[in-house]
Amino acid sequence: MHHVRMVKLPAEASDPHALRSRARRSWLVFAAVALVLLAAGLLLARDYGRSQALAGLAGQSRIDASLKASLLRAVVERQRALPLVLADDAAIRGALLSPDRPSLDRINRKLEALATSAEAAVIYLIDRSGVAVAASNWQEPTSFVGNDYAFRDYFRLAVRDGMAEHFAMGTVSNRPGLYISRRVDGPGGPLGVIVAKLEFDGVEADWQASGKPAYVTDRRGIVLITSLPSWRFMTTKPIAEDRLAPIRESLQFGDAPLLPLPFRKIEARPDGSSTLDALLPGDSTAAFLRVETMVPSTNWRLEQLSPLKAPLAAGAREAQLLTLAALVPLLALAALLLRRRQVVAMRSAEERLARNALEASVEERTRDLRMARDRLETEIADHRQTTEKLQAVQQDLVQANRLAILGQVAAGVAHEINQPVATIRAYADNARTFLHRGQTVTAAENMESIAELTERVGAITDELRRFARKGHFAAGPTAMKEVVEGALMLLRSRFAGRMDAIRLDLPPDGLQALGNRIRLEQVLINLLQNALEAIGDSEDGAIQVRCEEAAGGIALTVADNGPGIAADVREELFTPFNTSKEDGLGLGLAISKEIVSDYGGTIEVESGPSGTTFAVNLKKA
């Protein structure tokens, strides 16, 4: 008979009602803590996501701005060549020396043709006094011929320095543009100035289509080129009145008031960019990220505004979703642990109450308890037996799976080592013959080749073992010339007398693909073997092997003039164990495709009555 010693516990620990009350309080505290954590996590995630999105947007915006600046430079550089060439033109110089009507008419037509072909807004010739004597727009109502440009900086600076570039509003056309000028010199000194005007309508249209406001400013901060026409000739910062007066008097920007750009809340960032609010046409305000870069070969600065609202919202949303994805499972786990603890405590309390209530009758129920214990031990034993049987079944399943994989590997090895083994046998027969003849040097060379081929057999079996378990050889730069030569070496003995049918274009030494030499040799051997078997003993049989660069990669092609592949066979050509040969296993092309796929390449096949072409496309190293 068993005697149970009773231990008195605190009332709260053994009272289920007290435990339930405490559990409700615990859940209220847990809910409050969870809400605080979620709120704090979402707020922090929002700020972090916005910060990361802003950094990413800044990087992309700098790339966009640099690209725009490079394209703008290309446009300007293309037009700079016109005045440079025309300044040395004999006809231009002759027209300034003898400005008669026939010579000026010829110059007008010449400039008109040049402006059309070079996409210049206008090209015009100014004499020594500053009056335009010829222009590409000589037939238009806004012709520059006869106008006095002596006050223009691009004329004065070109006469003084030989060349000048000046952005201004046209006094006749009322269209802004860049004036590129060169002095025309004669035997006695300056004869005049040739000017090409470049307008940026196409550039501005492209910028406008991008949806990101962009503009170019000069060294004074005045906007010259912009995707928003209303911002033209505005300034990035206020200009002092004593500096504004001479700019307005020069008529460089017409009657533009030169007001500051409508930017507010400008905040600089450590990376050189800044955020701001801009008033857009239509009285709408939006937040932007501003980045800037210099336009090469000019003193211009290109600034681009990237909208902030959508990227920041997306960054905050993504970070908050990730935070929820992390916090919700953790909170769920915490709730589960809390619930489990409460259930365990409640169960323990109930058990203790039941034990206290049955304390008086424990002696009478000892026998029943012993019997219950025996039944429990029996059930435990049964459970252990069931568990052992289940483990045995699981081990049988694992063993069966291993046997299936070993079957695939064995089938692959039987196919792939057939080629080098046949070559080894041929080398061995030749070595024996050479030994009988006393040609020991040649026999030794054959034995060395056999040693190399045995190493290659070991490499092939290792490769096929890895193929059967979906393994991968590390990819690296592989010389395609060595791949082609290695494959031909393996096939030379087996197909002796038929190798002359192969027409080979060896790749250059420096041509390297991304892959592994031995595995790529396997692919080429399979393709060449199929091609040699396809042409058979035909006297006019031919195989063309070519390896060259193509479409950013490397194309290795094997083409034969055999009878081609039947349509029903071609549909499942790369399916394992699918073959039309009596002694074939149907694994060669399947393995080849798997090898090429491992290195990011593809195999394509074209077949017809006149022959079959396999194309292996690989990545260039």
UniProtKB/Swiss-Prot annotation:
Periplasmic-facing ranges: 46-320
Pfam families in UniProt: HATPase_c, HisKA
Enzyme class, spelled out: transferase
Membrane topology: Multi-pass membrane protein
Gene Ontology molecular functions: ATP binding; phosphorelay sensor kinase activity
SMART domains: HATPase_c (SM00387), HisKA (SM00388)
EC number: 2.7.13.3
Catalysed reaction equations from the record: ATP + protein L-histidine = ADP + protein N-phospho-L-histidine
Domain spans labelled Histidine kinase: 412-621
UniProt keyword annotation of NAD present: no
Positions of modified residues (Phosphohistidine): H415
GO cellular component assignments: plasma membrane
UniProt keywords, alphabetically: ATP-binding, Cell inner membrane, Cell membrane, Kinase, Membrane, Nucleotide-binding, Phosphoprotein, Plasmid, Transferase, Transmembrane, Transmembrane helix, Two-component regulatory system
InterPro entries from the UniProt entry: HATPase_C_sf, His_kinase_dom, HisK_dim/P_dom, HisK_dim/P_sf, Sensor-like_sf, Sig_transdc_His_kin-like_C, Sig_transdc_His_kinase_DctB
Post-translational modification comment from the UniProt entry: Autophosphorylated.
TM annotation in the entry: 27-45, 321-338
Keyword Manganese attached: no
Location(s), subcellular: Cell inner membrane
Role: Member of the two-component regulatory system DctB/DctD involved in the transport of C4-dicarboxylates. DctB functions as a membrane-associated protein kinase that phosphorylates DctD in response to environmental signals.
Official protein name in the record: C4-dicarboxylate transport sensor protein DctB
Species name: Rhizobium meliloti (strain 1021)
Taxonomic placement: Bacteria, Pseudomonadati, Pseudomonadota, Alphaproteobacteria, Hyphomicrobiales
Gene: dctB
